[in-house]
Amino acid sequence: MSNSTVGKLKGFIASKGKRTKIAVAGGAAVVVAVAGYLLVSSYASGFFVSVDPENATVTGNASVVADASASGGKAVQFTGPASTGGGGGTGGGGTGGTATCTGSANTPGGSDGMGGCWPGSNNTGVPSGTALSAYTGSCTITTNNLTIDAKTINCPGDLLVRASNVIITRSKITGHVVVDTDVSQGYSLSMTDIEIHADGDLPVVYNGNVNILRANISGGHNALECQEHSSHCSLRDSWVHDQWQAPTGDTHLGGVAHFGEQVACTGTGTNGMTAVCFDIEHSSVVCDAPVNASGGGCTGDINMIAHYGPIPGAFIYKNLLSANVGASYCTYGGEAPENGATRIVYQDNIFQRGTNSKCGSYGPVTGFKFSHAGNLWTNNKYNDGSTITCTAADECL
């Protein structure tokens, strides 16, 4: 969507009623009625608008514009940050208009070449202007369908989720977030417009059954790590960066990781692909920790390594993978000595070349086998536009 015209509410000029505050959630259709008059559903991203139908005024991220198709000839036009579309049918890219980006093209926050911006500091995390208050609830969540909004969450250990359908929005979290799928595969968590930072040699968010949208995640040895009892793991329109690093020791760091399944996968990609275990879409995935004194450092940006079981489905779509000569490869495609990977789809991703022109120390990708059923490598390119060609060998060069 465009950063200017992302949708209109039609017909409010002709209606009568009290001032109404309209919250339009990112990627969701919203229908608003004022004094019995149906306005119109629209798609938008993080907008909060006050409409005064009686005086025909509107304030917030919107303006009144002429529209011959609207009742009364006028409509409300929303304005604001471009949606990258991670919750929509195209999987991100903001192809509906020209977005206002920060930084160079094909860097976090910069142009993604698809009419939108890569996720970065300018378009992830808590929306600007959000007033946060301290979270006073338990750091072990056991209430199903709980929603936490606009909070600062500081748990001395972990924020532990032992409930289903927990939702956290517009919040800043310090510490690790754990969905305890080892206890129950029914536990699940969704997080939108959040900032999370955690120190120490653990993932920031793990074990799985999690959907993350427009997040700014830093620290940990992985931003998101999905393990064997996770039925789905999704990261969209998000920025992961600045991993924790010890001064010495054999550290193995990454952006996001999946280490194999022992349960059936239930996720769905925006292309309609079903039974997806690991869904990473339109995200800036950066492993930028330096190599330490012992040679420990980044394994890669997106790492699928089937240690604990096979990986039977992954959708890696329209992501920016950051170059780091300290990393072996920028992505691992699922293979491991213990298990294999099938239905692994890499599509329309951009790999930074970096200083050695190969993204990682040895190349862009390893552990991806064409011989396994459903594996697909299509239209993946370096940031200079050149195609990364894969052959039927184990590695792409």
Predicted regions and their residues:
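Ser/Thr/Gly/Pro-rich low-complexity, disordered linker/stalk segments of secreted
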Residues: A82-M114
